[in-house]
UniProtKB/Swiss-Prot annotation:
Family: Belongs to the universal ribosomal protein uS11 family.
Source organism per UniProt: Sulfurovum sp. (strain NBC37-1)
GO annotation, cellular component aspect: ribonucleoprotein complex; ribosome
Gene Ontology BP term (one): translation
The protein's name: Small ribosomal subunit protein uS11
Keyword tags: Ribonucleoprotein, Ribosomal protein, RNA-binding, rRNA-binding
Annotated function: Located on the platform of the 30S subunit, it bridges several disparate RNA helices of the 16S rRNA. Forms part of the Shine-Dalgarno cleft in the 70S ribosome.
Molecular function per GO: rRNA binding; structural constituent of ribosome
Gene3D superfamilies registered for this protein in UniProt: Ribosomal protein S11 (3.30.420.80)
NCBIfam families assigned: PRK05309.1 (NF003698), uS11_bact (TIGR03632)
A Pfam family hit: Ribosomal_S11
Subunit structure: Part of the 30S ribosomal subunit. Interacts with proteins S7 and S18. Binds to IF-3.
Amino acid sequence: MAKKKAKKSIAKGVVYVAATFNNTVITVTDEMGNVISWSSAGALGFKGSKKSTPFAATEAVADAMAKAKENGIKEVGIKVQGPGSGRDTAVKAIGATEGIRVTFLKDITPLPHNGCRPPKKRRV
């Protein structure tokens, strides 16, 4: 039988929002970068194109923040990465979470200084 995971009491944390065109992944860490909780649209049962919707991102945030609050998180900073549609909605949902105070918001999307050639444009 597996041992029950010990509850940590961490007051401050960082929420990483990775918003791709296909999915939105939310990871809550402590200040050192150790993962406390995570959630994604796909992990919540959204399939296919429904994973990339703003609603799916909101649900993923609610799930990850509920797990984080169990561990005592009260203050978070937000780091957002990627161009996905769930990006803005996820940030708003974190801000609207009861009992959580947002300290900073930072965009950490990697931008090339003219690196790799991008994929060809779609012709539909």
